[in-house]
UniProtKB/Swiss-Prot annotation:
PANTHER family linked: MOLYBDOPTERIN SYNTHASE RELATED
UniProt family annotation: To M.jannaschii MJ0717.
Organism encoding this protein: Synechocystis sp. (strain ATCC 27184 / PCC 6803 / Kazusa)
GO cellular-component term (any): cytosol
Protein name per its UniProtKB record: Uncharacterized protein slr0903
One GO term (biological process): Mo-molybdopterin cofactor biosynthetic process
Length: 145
C-alpha cells in the first residue's frame, strides 16, 4: 500500500516509512521538518496540546499544498503528516519531508509546505496549561493572512 502524500493522523507519526517512501534515485537531497509539542508558550507552562481538524478539507488542501510545492521547487516528492487529538510534550505534531536533486530546492520546498500548512489548513490548537485554564490559540487561517 502506497503512503498518502498528505495525511491527518490521530496516532504518533512514524517517520521511518515516510523517509523510505521519499527515496528516489534522482534525489540528491532530503530535507525534513518535525514540529514538536513544547512545554511553554507566552510565558505559560504547557502540559499538552489538543488539535481539532476539519479532516476532509484539511486533506484536500494538504494535497494541493504538496502539489504546489512539487511544481514550484521542482521537488521529486514531498510528504506531510499533521496530528489530530491530544498530544503530550515532546510528541511530533507535524512532519514534512521533501526530496529534490539539490539541497536548496528541498529546503525551500519544506519551508513552503510547513508555512502553507500553518496558514491554510483548518486545524485548531488548544493549549492545556498547568496553572491556567486551557485556551484555543491563534490560528493563521482564521485571519485572512
Amino acid at each position: 500500500m502506497a503512503l498518502a502524500l498528505f495525511d491527518i493522523s490521530d496516532q504518533p507519526i512514524n517517520t521511518q516509512p515516510l523517509i523510505s517512501a521519499l527515496q528516489c534515485d534522482q534525489a540528491g537531497a532530503l530535507v525534513t521538518f518535525a514540529g514538536w509539542v513544547r512545554n511553554h508558550n507566552d510565558g505559560k507552562q504547557v502540559d499538552s496540546l489538543e488539535y481539532q481538524v476539519y479532516r476532509e478539507l484539511a486533506i484536500n488542501e494538504g494535497f494541493k499544498i504538496i502539489a504546489e510545492a512539487k511544481e514550484k521547487y521542482d521537488l521529486h516528492q514531498a510528504i506531510a503528516v499533521h496530528r489530530s487529538g491530544h498530544l503530550k510534550i515532546g510528541e511530533t505534531a507535524v512532519w514534512v519531508g521533501t526530496v529534490a536533486s539539490h539541497r536548496q530546492a528541498a529546503f525551500q520546498g519544506t519551508q513552503y509546505v510547513i508555512d502553507q500548512i500553518k496558514l491554510r489548513l483548518p486545524i485548531w490548537k488548544k493549549e492545556h496549561y498547568f496553572d491556567y485554564p486551557a485556551t484555543w490559540v491563534y490560528c493563521c487561517h482564521h485571519h485572512g493572512s
